[in-house]
C-alpha cells in the first residue's frame, strides 16, 4: 500500500514528504528515469528510488522512447487539455495529453481540433507578433497566438503570390512579414510587405 515518508535532514528540503507504493514489501520503482505503474486502475509515475512523481514529467516508455506526461498533486496521470504553470518560465502553458488507446496520457504530437501541439505543448505565436511558423513532421505551419493553424480556403487567393492560384492566403504579422499558406496551413512562402 501507500506510505508517506519524510525526507532525510540535510539531503531533502525541510519537511519534504515522499510517497511510495509498496507491494510484497518492495516499493514500485523505475529501472531507469521514470516509469508508469498502475495502482487501483490509475496510472502513477515513480523514479528509481520509488518516489511518486507529480507535475509535468518525461517518462520512459516500454518501447524505449520517452513522452511528456502530467500528474496531479495526488500523483494521478491526467489526460486531455491541461493548463500547467511553468515555474522556470513563470508562465501558464496549454497542453494536451492523449485521452485513450495505447498512448493514453502521452503528450499529443500533431494537429488536433485545428490546434498544433508538439509533444503535448500547444504551439502559439507571441501575442505581439500575432503569427509564428512552427515545424511539425517536416512541414512549417503558421499558427496564431491561440495555437490555431492558419489556413486558406479553397477559393482564396494570395496577393503576395498570385501565380499560385486558388487555395492560398496571406497573413501579415506585426513585423510586416507576409506568410502565404495553403488549405492545410503549410507555409508556402514568407515575404516582407511592400
Spans of features found by a protein language model:
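Extracellular adhesion/carbohydrate-binding repeat motifs centered on closely spaced tryptophans
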Residues: 1-194
Amino acid at each position: 500500500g501507500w506510505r508517506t515518508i519524510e525526507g532525510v535532514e540535510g539531503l531533502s528540503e525541510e519537511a519534504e514528504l515522499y510517497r511510495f507504493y509498496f507491494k510484497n514489501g518492495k516499493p514500485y520503482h523505475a529501472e531507469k528515469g521514470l516509469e508508469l505503474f498502475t495502482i487501483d486502475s490509475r496510472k502513477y509515475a515513480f523514479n528509481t528510488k520509488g518516489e511518486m512523481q507529480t507535475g509535468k514529467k518525461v517518462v520512459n516508455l516500454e518501447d524505449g522512447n520517452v513522452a511528456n506526461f502530467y500528474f496531479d498533486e495526488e500523483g494521478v496521470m491526467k489526460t486531455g487539455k491541461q493548463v500547467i504553470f511553468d515555474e522556470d518560465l513563470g508562465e501558464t502553458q496549454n497542453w494536451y495529453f492523449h485521452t485513450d488507446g495505447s498512448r493514453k496520457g502521452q503528450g499529443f504530437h500533431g494537429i488536433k481540433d485545428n490546434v498544433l501541439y508538439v509533444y503535448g505543448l500547444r504551439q502559439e505565436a507571441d501575442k505581439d507578433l500575432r503569427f509564428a511558423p512552427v515545424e511539425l513532421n517536416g512541414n512549417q505551419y503558421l499558427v496564431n497566438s491561440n495555437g490555431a493553424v492558419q489556413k486558406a480556403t479553397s477559393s482564396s487567393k494570395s496577393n503576395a503570390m498570385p501565380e499560385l492560384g486558388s487555395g492560398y492566403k496571406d497573413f501579415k504579422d506585426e513585423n510586416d512579414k507576409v506568410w502565404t499558406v495553403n488549405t492545410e496551413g503549410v507555409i508556402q512562402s514568407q515575404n516582407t510587405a511592400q
